[in-house]
Design a protein with these regions (language model features):
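Active-site catalytic motif of lipid deacylating hydrolases and related acyltransferases
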Residues: 2-60
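Catalytic histidine-centered segment of alpha/beta-hydrolase-like enzymes
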Residues: 41-42, 165-175
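Active-site nucleophile loop of the alpha/beta-hydrolase fold
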Residues: 35-38, 91-100
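Gly/Ala-rich beta-loop-alpha elbow adjacent to hydrolase catalytic centers
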Residues: 67-77
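Conserved alpha/beta-hydrolase fold motif
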Residues: 66-67, 90
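Conserved alpha/beta-hydrolase "acid-adjacent" motif
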Residues: 16-17, 141-147, 170
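Short beta-strand/loop motif that positions the catalytic acidic residue
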Residues: 128-129, 133-136, 140, 148
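Short glycine-rich catalytic loops that host catalytic nucleophiles or stabilize transition states
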Residues: 33-36, 160-166
Length: 183
């Protein structure tokens, strides 16, 4: 029986495409929430509560594997903030950890509760995950490596900043990462 994995893709992402498709190719049963369709229509707080409920119902164990990408990681981190320490392994790729903007593209984003993660973590109120790896590109203006690194330090997560990479980490890098992380 294949091992199950919980996956949250980035904004507008599907669990059956991209990384989700690669996880299926590797023999995993992929569960999670797509950030499109009915789930996207839910109130933000309900989205976060739904993810927390999913984790508690089916993935609250030491051998659980959870992967989240970009905005999906933001939803996951907020869901985990309302729970006790997650017992499984977490892999975050280019996570959004708060607001961001880019002067060159004149694009910015302020997610709901943009400061909550840092506020909880800096006060020691964020439940420290048992195992959390974070990977972000050095040129990622959405995840902002300095912000990711600062948050990771507060929650005892291992962070890797991939030199020269942007928000979409190279497929070869992610494939190699999965080779070691999924063991």
């Amino acid at each position: 029986m294949p091992q199950s994995i919980y996956f949250l893709p980035g904004h507008g992402g599907r669990i059956s495409n991209g990384l989700g498709q690669e996880l299926v190719r590797r023999g995993f049963d992929v569960f999670g929430r797509e950030t499109v369709g009915e789930f996207k229509k839910l109130d933000f707080d309900v989205q976060v509560e739904t993810i927390a409920a999913d984790l508690k119902a089916s993935f609250w164990r030491e051998d659980a594997l959870v992967i989240a990408n970009s905005y999906g990681a933001y939803l996951l981190l907020l869901a985990l903030s309302s729970l006790i320490t997650f017992p499984g392994k977490i892999l975050l790729l280019s996570p959004i950890v708060g607001e961001f903007s880019n002067d060159q593209t004149r694009i910015g984003f302020i997610p709901p509760y943009a400061k909550r993660l840092f506020e909880l973590a800096s006060k020691g109120l964020y439940p420290i995950p048992n195992s959390c790896q974070i990977h972000v590109g050095s040129q990622d203006w959405q995840s902002i490596p300095d912000n990711v690194t600062a948050f990771a330090a507060l929650v005892n997560a291992q962070v890797t900043v991939l030199e020269g990479a942007g928000h979409n980490l190279p497929k070869e890098y992610v494939a190699s990462l999965l080779d070691t992380w999924l063991i």
